[in-house]
Amino acid sequence: MSEIKAKWIAADWGTTHMRAWAIGEEDSVLAFRESNEGMKDLQQNEFEPVLLRLIESWLDDTKVTTVMACGMVGAKQGWVETPYLKTPCVPLDNNQLTTANTHDKRIKVHLVPGVMQHHPADIMRGEETQIAGFINKNLDFNGVVCLPGTHAKWANIKEGQIASFKTFMTGELFGVISSHTLIRHSTSIKGWNQDSFEAGVLEGFKNPGSIASNLFSLRAESIVNDLDRDQARSTLSGLLLGVELNGAQNFWKGNDVTLIGSELLSNNYHQGLKILGGQSQLFSLETATLSGLSSAFRDLNNS
């Protein structure tokens, strides 16, 4: 088997996870690796060693390999802070790329900028690259993109620009509530009940002001009525998504939404929207990420 040597390397480095792809000619994916060493667990001087552990076998000792990276790696607490583009703006601007200082002469690491919004205040890092990648594949798109995740983003796209966006901490809230509150004693770790999820979505959407009470009811139901742990977990997920969909109505009502995220999360959002009469379709997260970073790499080399 021939040894894999990358023409360039794409990296999506988030808060809790890092993914890297060895890219060959015509943007072909030669190899993929991932790590749970996210931004939140690393000091500034640890980013380069972590990256090298993942990609070293893809490097050619006779040349410099470009690494294009997006995500929280460019945050203030990351490898090196990158600037924010201000909405309305194109998702990616290579004039704002930041080069990280590296000790290994075989790599040159470029970090893409994030996007900020002044009123209401909001920020994104990583999602702008995925939005750019989606737009690259859908040049005439005008509409709404939703990126489910730890911090879900809803963005209005107009004429190739991010016009406005809104963030919901739904994923993080689910993690905290299911793992670090009293409710953890009533929920399963991985189980799922679709009917409970859908009922939770409807309740969360119709009565968002009752979310604090509905959350405690999960604990009470488990004690008083022996609520199944899988049902409790699924209801919790549905409640939180329902509250988010209530708050995001201005984005999805009357619009066809494109969901860009993991297959599991995107399917949950798709089902949640469907229950409420919304329309949506899924777009591959990996395709969006690689398309965005590939565009940045090409522009960098043509500049």
Where are these regions (language model features)?
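Short glycine-rich, Thr/Ser-proximal phosphate-binding strand/loop in the N-terminal lobe
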Residues: E3, W8-E46, F283
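Short beta-strand-loop/turn "lid" adjacent to the catalytic site in phosphate-handling enzymes
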Residues: W58-M124, E159
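Short glycine-aspartate micro-motif
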Residues: W8-D12, T66-M68, G143-L147, T258-L259
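Glycine-rich phosphate-binding loop plus the immediately following alpha-helix
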Residues: K40-Q43, V115-P148, K153-N207
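N-terminal phosphate-binding loop and adjacent alpha-helix
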Residues: V29-T65, G74-Q77, E81, I183-T187
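Glycine-rich phosphate-binding/hydrolytic loop that grips phosphoryl groups
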Residues: L239, N246, Q281-S303
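Adenine-nucleotide phosphate-binding core of ATP-dependent small-molecule kinases
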Residues: G204-G247
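Glycine-rich phosphate-binding loops at beta-strand->alpha-helix junctions
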Residues: H17, G254-G272
